[in-house]
């Protein structure tokens, strides 16, 4: 029995990607490199992880990787770097708004295609990561939640720091 079909999943996944895009587009230049929170002494990610631009990149990077379903053989498109694969890494150079918006469009298309062509066999393919393993379809629900979490953090930051109102996207087109 099918409970959620491809179109339902895409409309909601696309909506969270669109809201992330709103945050990236609406960020004033003076906040692009500002941190949402202070670094922690025991964090395993690079110092500066919570910079607005980097949190956007982090979200897109993992969206792309999780749509692939495996770390092995994954590489983000140029000019982006592999990140967060090893403790103690350094931050990549600051990516521009335009670069991140192009990556967002790339990920949006990849997500729509991945969901639209997802077969029963692909949905149940087991995906393994350092933090655990789960079927590919469940990984996409995890992925959606991850994009929503960071998109909401960025939008809340813009509301607090720049008085920007977030527009709710109920469904992607």
Map each language-model feature to its residues:
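Hydrophobic alpha-helical core bundles mediating ligand binding, dimerization, or RNAP-core interactions
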Residues: 13, 17-20, 24, 104, ...
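Acidic/histidine-rich alpha-helical segments that form the ligand environment
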Residues: 87-127, 135-150
């Amino acid at each position: 029995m099918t409970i959620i079909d491809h179109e339902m999943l895409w409309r909601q996944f696309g909506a969270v990607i669109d809201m992330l895009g709103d945050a990236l587009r609406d960020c004033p230049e003076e906040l692009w490199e500002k941190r949402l929170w202070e670094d922690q002494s025991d964090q395993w990610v690079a110092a500066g992880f919570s910079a607005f631009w980097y949190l956007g990149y982090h979200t897109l990077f993992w969206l792309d990787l999780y749509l692939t379903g495996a770390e092995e053989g994954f590489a983000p498109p140029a000019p982006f770097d592999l990140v967060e694969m090893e403790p103690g890494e350094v931050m990549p150079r600051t990516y521009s708004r335009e670069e991140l918006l192009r990556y967002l469009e790339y990920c949006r298309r990849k997500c729509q295609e991945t969901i639209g062509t997802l077969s029963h066999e692909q949905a149940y393919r087991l995906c393994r990561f350092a933090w655990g393993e789960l079927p590919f379809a469940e990984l996409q629900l995890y992925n959606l939640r991850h994009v929503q979490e960071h998109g909401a953090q960025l939008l809340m930051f813009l509301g607090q720091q720049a008085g920007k109102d977030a527009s709710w996207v109920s469904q992607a087109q």
